């Protein structure tokens, strides 16, 4: 018998169904939420978990929130203990493993899934059995069966990198949350002041942007425009920040009726199709078009994946392997969707080579693998599917072709210019979700020809502050700054909202007074520890653990020491 452990019940059922006729057995627990079951099929026993089964907690003697408990968490390695969240799994897993010839970890195929697999192996400590890893890219039954024929080795380094993150976040979160709640309860409020390494750094981004907007002082500037035929020209020195200079030039040209065209340039510009879709792009596009949080986008994608409609949705990769059969996949998309004609044209013209982006050998990019016209009456899930489908079809499309036109001319020797862009071939934009960016159409002009000036104007404008973050722009900034991972970023905005540090209105993110005050009190003593650079550095260290270049426990110890110094600095400043 082979023991297979999955991360979720639905995945356990999908694997069992792919392998053959199965029967369900109760291993323990009562009621829908606490019942532990197995699926028996062929010579496999499949046990589904419910996510992480173990967690870090403080021992009973440190449950009381005091400053001394903070010191213990930061200085005593035994102050955090790993315990079962669901105690009922331990004995059934051990009993089954004793009689198994092999243990197959079939948790989600990403770093978090590898870490949950590590929890399974810790549960089976002392039971020596061969361990293999099932790595799935889709939940299509034939793909599941094929994956069982090419099981991998379990990636301990990847699992340890997540273990390091979880333990560092527990040390920092437990100690800082207690320290802040005890020290600032009369300044910020008596509610718990939650602190997290990624969470608080993300809050800092939102607060810094709000301050930038609040402190922004608009500066006036002037633009001089002229209308010739039906085309709007602008003075080439615009914008003017010197009012006197702007008015001087305006007075010089405002009554002139002659525009001398000096140059006309036309050039063809090709805009290439997008790179294949990874998680970050899916979250950005999904939250922008569907007006929902990134975590909800990921939840919808998970549903589509478990329904064998798309490939695995947690992926960094933007380059397909050479073995991926796009012709076969496009054939599946020829019916039952609104873009079958476009897919048919791709096949007819043999356009089946996708664009390439960054390479990360975790999974294929996110790909539609089934053609549907609705999804269980879930409109949002279907709309996300259509975005993924549009993106996939667009990566094969021909480039879009534009003609860019620039017209230069003189009014009273003052240089004016007009720019235009005309779309001449839609290319991949025929199916892509973003429309092509065209500039204003301009009239036909001939060099060394004089035209009538229909009017000259001077416009006073003001500089504007940067916009507040939206869900998608904050996600993009987090990725740019190296804050969090593809697994942790989507939930972070919702966590900040749940803890009343930010609020969202029409997809625009605002810090609350509580969030502003928290940053105000900790940025001076903890500036180094809440900066994006610090969080990014920790993520880089965890990547070293994943590559086998660093010991995870040494990383935890060094970050523990660093944060103990941060707390000491905070207390010194407070006193």
Segments (PLM) and residue ranges:
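C-terminal or mid-to-C-terminal helical accessory/interaction module adjacent to the motor/catalytic core
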Residues: 85, 90-91, 98-99, 139-228, ...
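Structured, non-catalytic alpha/beta "coupling" segments that mediate domain-domain communication
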Residues: 30-62, 200-245, 393-441, 547, ...
């Amino acid at each position: 018998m082979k023991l297979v452990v999955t991360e979720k019940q639905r995945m356990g059922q999908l694997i069992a169904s792919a392998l053959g006729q199965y029967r369900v057995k109760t291993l323990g627990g009562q009621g829908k939420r606490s019942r532990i079951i197995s699926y028996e099929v062929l010579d496999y026993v499949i046990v589904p978990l419910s996510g992480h089964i173990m967690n870090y907690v403080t021992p009973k003697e440190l449950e009381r929130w005091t400053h001394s408990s903070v010191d213990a968490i930061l200085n005593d390695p035994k102050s955090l203990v790993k315990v079962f969240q669901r105690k009922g799994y331990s004995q059934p897993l051990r009993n089954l493993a004793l009689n198994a010839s092999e243990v197959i970890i079939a948790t989600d195929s990403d770093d978090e899934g590898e870490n949950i697999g590590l929890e399974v192996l810790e549960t089976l400590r002392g039971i020596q059995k061969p361990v293999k890893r099932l790595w799935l890219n889709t939940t299509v039954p034939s793909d599941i069966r094929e994956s069982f024929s090419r099981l991998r080795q379990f990636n301990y380094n990847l699992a340890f990198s997540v273990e390091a993150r979880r333990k560092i976040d527990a040390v920092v979160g437990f100690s800082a949350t207690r320290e802040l709640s005890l020290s600032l309860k009369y300044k910020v409020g008596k509610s718990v002041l939650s602190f997290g390494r990624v969470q608080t750094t993300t809050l800092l981004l939102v607060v810094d942007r709000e301050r930038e907007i609040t402190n922004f002082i608009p500066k006036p500037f002037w633009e001089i425009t002229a209308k010739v035929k039906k085309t709007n020209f602008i003075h080439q020195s615009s914008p003017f920040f010197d009012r006197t200079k702007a008015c001087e030039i305006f007075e010089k040209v405002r009554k002139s009726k002659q525009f001398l065209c000096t140059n006309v340039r036309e050039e063809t510009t090709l805009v290439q199709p997008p790179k294949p879709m990874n998680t970050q792009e899916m979250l950005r596009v999904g939250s922008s078009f569907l007006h929902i949080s990134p975590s909800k986008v990921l939840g919808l994608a998970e549903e589509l994946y478990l329904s064998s409609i798309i490939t695995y949705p947690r992926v960094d990769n933007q380059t397909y392997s050479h073995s991926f059969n796009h012709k076969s996949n496009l054939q599946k998309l020829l019916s039952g969707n609104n873009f079958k004609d476009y897919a048919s044209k791709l096949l007819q013209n043999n356009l089946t080579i996708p664009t390439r982006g960054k390479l990360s050998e975790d999974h294929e990019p996110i790909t539609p693998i089934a053609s549907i016209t609705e999804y269980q009456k879930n409109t949002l899930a279907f709309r996300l599917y259509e975005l993924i489908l549009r993106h996939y079809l667009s990566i094969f499309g021909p480039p879009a072709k534009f003609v860019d036109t620039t017209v230069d001319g003189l009014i009273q020797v003052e240089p004016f210019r007009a720019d235009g862009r005309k779309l001449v071939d839609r290319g991949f934009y025929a199916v892509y979700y973003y429309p092509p960016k065209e500039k204003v159409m301009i009239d036909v002009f001939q060099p060394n020809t004089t035209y009538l000036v229909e009017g000259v104007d001077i416009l006073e404008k003001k500089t504007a502050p940067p916009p507040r973050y939206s869900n998608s722009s904050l996600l993009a900034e987090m990725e740019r700054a190296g804050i969090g991972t593809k697994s942790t970023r989507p939930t972070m905005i919702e966590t900040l909202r749940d803890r009343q540090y930010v609020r969202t209105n029409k997809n625009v993110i605002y810090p609350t007074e509580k969030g502003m005050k928290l940053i105000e009190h900790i940025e001076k003593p903890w500036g180094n520890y809440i900066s994006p650079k610090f969080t990014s550095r920790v993520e880089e260290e965890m990547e070293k653990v994943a590559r086998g270049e660093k010991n995870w426990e040494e990383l935890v110890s060094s970050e523990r020491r660093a944060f103990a110094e941060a707390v000491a600095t905070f207390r010194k400043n407070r006193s």
